[in-house]
């Protein structure tokens, strides 16, 4: 047993998707990339507010407004069990998920059909340019590393209290470096 980072245990449906687009009257998933990114952002409680994000996002021909208010990280619990959270807590996490989705160019999918998807390079770029994370945030491929170096890099991130987005089965990772 190595070090374990205590991160949020969130998913892609209610209340997380309360602000994602509705397509043909049906709710959409937040997307695994947006959810994982939100969990990392909640762990870091950063940023305080977005000042460089998109103001609208087009999903299947419909423009959706994106408005930003300061994040209230303390109103985003690590767990959203049914009946255990307030409307304000639901609204806070839903806004975060929508902000991420719009800024990573999420391809939204309707619940029960196809999932919502995003590109890892778009996530890394949004973390750097929109959400004001370190310019060292990067998207890397396991195939570019020897196993020992890959394992060492991941262990170092965890040891430095830096959760990362890890994507399977491609075994690619976007890391947040201070």
Identify the residue ranges that each predicted region occupies.
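Flexible, surface-exposed loop/gating regions in the mature catalytic domains
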Residues: 90, 108-120, 128-129, 138, ...
